[in-house]
């Protein structure tokens, strides 16, 4: 059996939403016994649509993830089993929050962390260069070794470079 793709789940969801819309219309225009049979048919249709969606979305224990080139599936339409969402995003949706907010906050946090790390790297590089300069002037016999270490780590003994 071919794996269920994201587009298939999308179609199943559209069917469920369409059935809900039809039920809403039938309830809104309810005229009594003559529309009761139609409403019953729509409710049965909803049950079938939900069962189909549930069956397609259920985890497949026999599923083994393989590269898209081997399965012949488009990367734009991956198998449902291969999609992994962070639990935090699921919590956001469960709390009726927009998952885009989580993504934005996550990106901002990563940017802040990257800026802090960049600052630390620049501070350590500057410290390395100053330390090397002071060591070379205080211990001339070690100057060649200090220069070798500084150059290997991307620095400059004369204080002009920053790795």
Swiss-Prot record:
Protein keywords: Activator, Nucleus, Transcription, Transcription regulation
Domain of life: Eukaryota
Subcellular location: Nucleus
GO biological process: regulation of transcription by RNA polymerase II
GO molecular-function term, one example from the UniProt record: transcription coregulator activity
Function (record text): Component of the Mediator complex, a coactivator involved in the regulated transcription of nearly all RNA polymerase II-dependent genes. Mediator functions as a bridge to convey information from gene-specific regulatory proteins to the basal RNA polymerase II transcription machinery. Mediator is recruited to promoters by direct interactions with regulatory proteins and serves as a scaffold for the assembly of a functional preinitiation complex with RNA polymerase II and the general transcription factors.
Protein name as it appears in the record: Mediator of RNA polymerase II transcription subunit 10
Organism: Coccidioides immitis (strain RS)
Lineage, uppermost ranks: Eukaryota, Fungi, Dikarya, Ascomycota, Pezizomycotina
